[in-house]
Amino acid sequence: MPGRERRDGGRSADDNKQNDRNERRGGGRRDDRRNQQQDERSQYIERVVTINRVSKVVKGGRRFSFTALVIVGDGKGMVGVGYGKAKEVPAAIQKGAEEARKNFFRVPMVNGTITHPVQGEKAAGIVMLKPAAPGTGVIAGGAARPVLECAGIQDILSKSLGSDNAINVVHATVDGLKQLVRPEEVAARRGKTIEEVAPARILRARAGQEA
């Protein structure tokens, strides 16, 4: 019937409009979620230390994939290291960044430098870290520098004493940073005041920050 066809045609047009409206709504939510994730990523500093191609021998031949060692930090004392593996380089970097954010830890700092000298070790990697005076800058090379910069350290002296392997150096640097303690923690542990425990340099820096 012509009337029925017109009614059916009108109903199908309305359905199409409703579907288009729903798709636009869903797309808007996805866009908002994607923009929110991009804003969260933009708040952090990301450094790719190394990318390697690895292979796996299977029955049909070799399967190649990529690994990425990524450092992520907020530049304000939070830093993390992640290791990602995927068939494509961008996916490996993304996985490494996600793992790095899960491994965040806080680095105790006073006036832009670390609180005391430490030595970090991981496998054959050995990294020595020392506090530095304001204006010194980040004296570090190789794979240790991205870790210190992402953590927000402004003045530090470092030296690699062991293997030059980037993975070992990064994890040795992280091990050293995790050994750092605040002067308040040392004073509480020893049952003394901060003035009795902390060096004069740290006390002057704390006084300058409070002022």
From Swiss-Prot:
Ribosomal protein in keyword set: yes
A single GO cellular-component term on record: small ribosomal subunit
GO biological process per UniProt: translation
Domain spans labelled S5 DRBM: 44-107
Record's function text: With S4 and S12 plays an important role in translational accuracy.
Record-stated family: Belongs to the universal ribosomal protein uS5 family.
UniProt remark on domains: The N-terminal domain interacts with the head of the 30S subunit; the C-terminal domain interacts with the body and contacts protein S4. The interaction surface between S4 and S5 is involved in control of translational fidelity.
Name of the protein this chain belongs to: Small ribosomal subunit protein uS5
Organism of provenance: Corynebacterium glutamicum (strain ATCC 13032 / DSM 20300 / JCM 1318 / BCRC 11384 / CCUG 27702 / LMG 3730 / NBRC 12168 / NCIMB 10025 / NRRL B-2784 / 534)
Gene responsible for this protein: rpsE
